[in-house]
Amino acid sequence: SDRTGIDPCNTLIQLNEFDERTRSLIGNRLFNICCLVFNPSSSSEYSQFQFLKPSYRVSRLSQIGSDFCRALLSDVFNLPIRKALGARFDWVFEFSKISDVISNAPYNEVLDILWYTCSWISRYTTAEFSNEMYKALNSLFEEEYVGYRFIAGEIVPITDKSEAVEIEQACHTPFDGARTQLQKALCFLSDREHPDYKNCVKESISAVESVCKVISGNEKAALKDALNGLIANGMNIHG
C-alpha cells in the first residue's frame, strides 16, 4: 500500500514488457513448482508419487530433476553436454539460468522458457497436477495484469477471463477432429514473434465445421450446408 511505501499493483495490461515485480513473481512461482516435482521433500503436503505418472514413478523418481536439466541445457540453451548419461545435474544450480532469463530477457523469451519448463513437467506428471500448475500460473497472470494465459498447454495472448474459460472448454470437446484443429489454432496464435492469425482463424473455422458435420449427420456437408441442416432441425445457433 502507499502507507507502507509499497507501490500499488500494476493496473496496465502487460503484453510486450513485464515489470520487475511480475518477473520476480513468475520466477518464484515457477521455482516452487519445480520444488514440488524435483524436490518433493521440500513440502510435507505432497508426495512425488502422487503426481508423477505411474510409468515414471519408479524409473524416474530419483533423477527427474537431472533429466530436466539435461534437456534444458541442450534444447533451450544449446550448450554442449559433457556429462555421462548416468551423471546427475543439480536442478537448483541450473535453475539460475532460468532465473536470469526471467529477470532480464525480453518478454517473449520469458514466456518461451516458462512454456518449455511447464510443458516438460506436464509430460511426466498427472493431468490433475498439470491443471493445477497451469491454474496457479494463470492466477498470477491475472493478478499481475499479464495479457497472456495458458490454454490447453499453450501460452496465448488473451486478457478476458470468460474468453479463456470458453476457449479452454472448447479445446476439451469430445469431437476428436475439432479438438485437433483447435489445438493447431492455438499453436498458430501462441507464436509470440510471428503469430499466424490467418491459419488460426482457418483452423478455428474448420473445427466448427467438424462439429457441425457430426451433429448434422452429414460428413460431406460444407459449413454453410451443415449449419442450414442444424437450423432446419430446430437448433438455435445464434445463442
For the regions a language model picked out, list residue spans one by one.
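Internal, Lys/Arg-enriched amphipathic helical interaction segments that engage polyanionic partners
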Residues: G27, N32-T180
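Long, charged low-complexity segments
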Residues: S1-N32, F38, A152, V156-T159, ...
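Amphipathic, oligomerization/interface secondary-structure segments
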Residues: A170-G239
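Charge-dense, low-complexity intrinsically disordered segments
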Residues: E17-E20, S24, N104, H172, ...
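Generic low-complexity, intrinsically disordered sequence content enriched
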Residues: N16-D19, F77, L186
